[in-house]
Amino acid sequence: MQDLKTYLSTAPVLAISSFIFLAGLLIEINRFFPDALTFAFF
């Protein structure tokens, strides 16, 4: 179990998991608020 914790706390695993989280968050924001970038100019 300690080896699994050590593996999950390494930098590539943390980076990939954070990128997946951010990508999912952006997808969900764009699903509920489509074309939100065009509203920034008004």
Swiss-Prot record:
Keyword Glycosyltransferase: no
Keywords: Chloroplast, Membrane, Photosynthesis, Photosystem I, Plastid, Thylakoid, Transmembrane, Transmembrane helix
Record field: transmembrane: 7-27
Cell location: Plastid, Chloroplast thylakoid membrane
Listed Pfam families: PSI_PsaJ
Source domain of life: Eukaryota
Gene3D superfamilies in alphabetical order: Single helix bin
Disulfide bridge positions per record: none
Lipid bilayer topology: Single-pass membrane protein
One annotated Gene Ontology cellular component of this protein: chloroplast thylakoid membrane
Gene Ontology biological process terms in this record: photosynthesis
Sequence similarity: Belongs to the PsaJ family.
Job description of the protein: May help in the organization of the PsaE and PsaF subunits.
PANTHER family: PHOTOSYSTEM I REACTION CENTER SUBUNIT IX, PTHR36082
Protein name: Photosystem I reaction center subunit IX
Organism, as annotated: Picea glauca (White spruce)
